[in-house]
């Protein structure tokens, strides 16, 4: 028995991949400002939401670049941290300037010994950072509560996202270095950019206008 294929979509229909949670709410608000007929979906178990000319797929953060890269979604919104970790060759035309944070190397306050093991949800970024600095540390991939790895001795340091730093201060931890700053980005499938250019290029242009820093509007 062969698997069913998704019916071919019209060139004027967009499929968008958005991450669940706060980013999705902010993304829908911004996309609505940009002219798409979107509203926040009502609470339900539905994972696909239909609007006039637009389908929204509600995904886990890490899956957004996959759906866009493989062409199931024409475009999506995802954090730069997730995008770099995924390593998918998607087009990234707009920094949307929300969901801002930073990926940092974190240790217990006052820790000064060598770093032999690092815990993180971002092994790709961690290995690149450690290799660049010549630190021969083992990288342990973790899924949540990353700070505990430093507090319990599982790791000598952790690499994790930081927004306000309040969680670090509450747990006697500090940032030692910043790997990079992250924010939400619009990503686009490269083939879709050609096939649906009449929908995607005006959307990209409008989002650039809406998110341009003061004094840089086109």
Swiss-Prot record:
InterPro entries: ATP_PRibTrfase_cat, ATP_PRibTrfase_CS, ATP_PRibTrfase_HisG, ATP_PRibTrfase_HisG_short. One of its GO terms (biological process) is L-histidine biosynthetic process. The keyword Transferase applies. One of its GO terms (molecular function) is ATP phosphoribosyltransferase activity. Pfam families: HisG. Keywords: Amino-acid biosynthesis, ATP-binding, Cytoplasm, Glycosyltransferase, Histidine biosynthesis, Nucleotide-binding, Transferase. Its EC number is 2.4.2.17. It is found in: Cytoplasm. Its main location: cytoplasm. It is an enzyme of class 2 (transferase). GO terms for cellular component: cytoplasm. It catalyses: 1-(5-phospho-beta-D-ribosyl)-ATP + diphosphate = 5-phospho-alpha-D-ribose 1-diphosphate + ATP. The keyword Transmembrane helix does not apply. Pathway: Amino-acid biosynthesis; L-histidine biosynthesis; L-histidine from 5-phospho-alpha-D-ribose 1-diphosphate: step 1/9. Lacks the C-terminal regulatory region which is replaced by HisZ. NCBIfam families: hisG (TIGR00070). Heteromultimer composed of HisG and HisZ subunits. Catalyzes the condensation of ATP and 5-phosphoribose 1-diphosphate to form N'-(5'-phosphoribosyl)-ATP (PR-ATP). Has a crucial role in the pathway because the rate of histidine biosynthesis seems to be controlled primarily by regulation of HisG enzymatic activity. PANTHER family: ATP PHOSPHORIBOSYLTRANSFERASE, ATP PHOSPHORIBOSYLTRANSFERASE ATP-PRTASE. Belongs to the ATP phosphoribosyltransferase family. Short subfamily. This is ATP phosphoribosyltransferase. It comes from Deinococcus radiodurans (strain ATCC 13939 / DSM 20539 / JCM 16871 / CCUG 27074 / LMG 4051 / NBRC 15346 / NCIMB 9279 / VKM B-1422 / R1).
């Amino acid at each position: 028995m062969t698997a069913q294929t998704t019916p071919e979509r019209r060139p004027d229909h967009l499929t968008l991949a958005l991450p669940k949670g706060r980013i999705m709410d902010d993304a829908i608000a911004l996309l609505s400002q940009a002219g798409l007929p979107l509203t926040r979906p009502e609470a339900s178990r539905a994972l696909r939401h239909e609007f006039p000319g637009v389908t929204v797929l509600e995904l886990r953060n890490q899956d957004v670049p996959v759906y866009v890269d493989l062409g199931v979604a024409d475009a999506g919104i995802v954090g730069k941290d997730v995008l770099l970790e995924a390593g998918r060759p998607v087009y990234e035309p707009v920094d949307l300037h929300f969901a801002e944070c930073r990926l940092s190397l974190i240790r217990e306050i006052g820790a000064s010994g060598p770093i032999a093991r690092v815990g993180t949800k971002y092994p790709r970024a961690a290995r690149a950072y450690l290799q660049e600095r010549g630190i021969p540390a083992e990288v342990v991939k973790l899924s949540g509560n990353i700070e505990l790895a430093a507090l319990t001795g599982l790791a000598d340091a952790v690499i994790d996202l930081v927004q306000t730093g309040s969680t670090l201060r509450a747990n006697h931890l500090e940032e030692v270095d910043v790997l990079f700053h992250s924010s939400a980005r619009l990503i686009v499938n490269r083939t879709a950019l050609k096939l649906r250019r009449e929908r995607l290029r005006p959307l990209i242009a409008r989002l650039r206008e809406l998110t341009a820093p003061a004094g840089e509007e086109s």
